[in-house]
């Protein structure tokens, strides 16, 4: 793989891609750093480029050196990783636009499907492991220590004086999970009250909460930073984000709503780029490694719900199952969600426009 040749392709890239490159960090067996933007040759036999969503950054920081050590033991090759972490939607657009990631971890299946549509990821990507998924979580609520606003469920987010944070679903895959959870909870409420799903009632429920939103940030991590800076009373986010911050000593109260959505996070080989770089074998090995007990334990350490059954069972007590838990299929699947919620004139557009 000729990194210098690849670095020349940076000229003319859109601004979002330049930001992705500026965010690149390198992790290798000896923590070597690479600088492909300057054309420097990396200190390794093989370079893998990982383009992931921002929430995965901390766990991958622990996982990649372990995979590099295993690859070295198995093949004798030293691997250097170049890593870019962005909001999931931004990362997917960057890869479609020319950011040559070999492997991608994204917040949702819909973002991987964008890469399939662009001819970058093979349509069979879900055949690997747990339908292509490497972690799970649920949408949860985080409040300040002691839960001063008495938040118990999504419905409390619509109360007067409650300031809410969640990121923008146009840039953040995590935010789409958040909006899906709120909208789905609205459908669940209507089903309980009327016996059928009522999209109008679900939209009204989403509108009532959105009216209390303090700001729409670019990514889940940006919303978390704003909350910890003192903005808002409650944040809608991934359960794993809250658990990871608590493990780092940050004071949060975690509330799992009665009706919330199961999050599933995929990973895939970006086959077109991996084949061009001659990294397909290593890229597939990394995906397989993400499913091993060793890697899944690390994901669990950072608050994710493992897809490995044995690791999940060992940590099951940490993962409450709410009574009304639903998955994306309750909303009709990703194609239906994209059409109903996030299309040009969809429900999210209507909520923003106040129509």
Model-derived segments and their meaning:
Residues 1-45:
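Short, low-complexity disordered leader/linker segments with a strong preference
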Residues 54-58, 88-91, 110-113, 141, ...:
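Solvent-exposed loop/turn segments at secondary-structure junctions
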Residues 133-137, 203-210, 217, 248-280, ...:
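Periplasmic-binding protein-like
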